Amino acid sequence: MKAIRANIPRALPTGARLVCADNTGARELEIIAVKGYKGVRRRYPAAGVGDIVVVTVKKGTPEIRKQVHYAVIVRQRKEYRRPDGTRVKFEDNAAVITNERGEPRGSEIRGAVAREAAERFSKIGTIASVIV
């Protein structure tokens, strides 16, 4: 896991619903915790692109539903600025189910993946179809 060069806003608080962008059988995820988050008093933990979050599956196949998993956020609607000055935003909030080290459980990723997430987690970058 490498550091991210862009300063990404943490736009997804706990309780946010995400689209699952892989083929593990999950369709909708809910963030219940953010791994490594150290906040200020009474602030909700929040995450952005490239963060590892703890999620529960709200919609999907019965085998994967109602369980707690790790996931990496690969897209967010809130725009962020890259060091070269370009601004990036996606049309949905999406994550990929992984293990605690950031290795994906699925074998394919649907849709675009942010370059920051692909650089930080190389296994996600190798199975991504499009990197933006």
Curated annotation (Swiss-Prot):
PROSITE patterns to which the protein is assigned, alphabetical: RIBOSOMAL_L14 (PS00049)
Key word rRNA-binding present: yes
Upper taxonomic lineage: Archaea, Methanobacteriati, Methanobacteriota, Archaeoglobi, Archaeoglobales
CDD domains in the record: Ribosomal_uL14 (cd00337)
SUPFAM superfamilies attached to this UniProt entry: Ribosomal protein L14
Keywords in alphabetical order: Ribonucleoprotein, Ribosomal protein, RNA-binding, rRNA-binding
Gene3D superfamilies xref list: Ribosomal protein L14
Subunit structure: Part of the 50S ribosomal subunit. Forms a cluster with proteins L3 and L24e, part of which may contact the 16S rRNA in 2 intersubunit bridges.
Superkingdom classification of source: Archaea
Function text: Binds to 23S rRNA. Forms part of two intersubunit bridges in the 70S ribosome.
Gene assigned in the entry: rpl14
GO cellular component, one term: cytosolic large ribosomal subunit
NCBIfam families: PRK08571.1, uL14_arch
Protein name as annotated: Large ribosomal subunit protein uL14
Keyword tRNA-binding attached: no
Recorded family membership: Belongs to the universal ribosomal protein uL14 family.
Pfam family, one: Ribosomal_L14
